[in-house]
Amino acid sequence: MYSFTNDYNEIAHPNVMEALNNLAGKRFTGYGTDGLCKQVAEQVKHRIGQPNADIHFFNGGTITNLTTISHILRPHQAVISVVGGHIDVHETGAIEASGHKVITVESGSGKLTPAHIEKVLSEHPDEYSVQPKVVYISNSTEIGTVYRKAELVALRKICDENGLFLF
């Protein structure tokens, strides 16, 4: 049986568990200042080809989403999500508490489509309404559906055409 409740409800891959077990009993300073975090940060810098990048780690999804969204949006901008999408119902109001609106659209599949985005954009056409700027998806969705590559490409295309971030 598959469960799409959240990523915290499932056990880690056996290789991850083995690596964690190898660290049992060792002490770390935490807050991203220990040797392991520094090592991983260096690996990330190498992977992205940015040796001077400033890498920080977050310990949960809500704080990650809140930090990212609050830093990429201006006060008059909003996030587009499906009704029942993760950011709509599982962030305990964190996004709204930052002053940003989550604009929701109905989707029986749990997925956003370019048509959904076009509809939201047409409903927010000028400076007198909140301006959509982030398109937020979860893959898999809250109901277990998974975006196909073609669907993701189509979302990327409409976001690029309209100056939206796909997150």
Language-model regions, residue ranges each:
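Conserved N-terminal alpha-helix of the aminotransferase class I/II PLP-enzyme fold
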Residues: H13-G60, V83-D88, A94
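Glycine/small-residue-rich loop that forms an oxyanion/phosphate-binding "nest" at active or ligand-binding sites
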Residues: I87-E91, E96-A97, I103-E106
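Conserved PLP-anchoring active-site segment centered on the Schiff-base-forming lysine
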Residues: H71-V89
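Short beta-strand/loop segments at the ligand-binding rim of alpha/beta enzyme cores
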Residues: C159-F167
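PLP-dependent aminotransferase-class I/II
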Residues: G99-E142, V146-A154, E161
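Conserved core of the PLP fold type I
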Residues: N52-L73, I103-S107
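Hydrophobic beta-strand scaffold residues
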Residues: V79, V102-I103, L166-F167
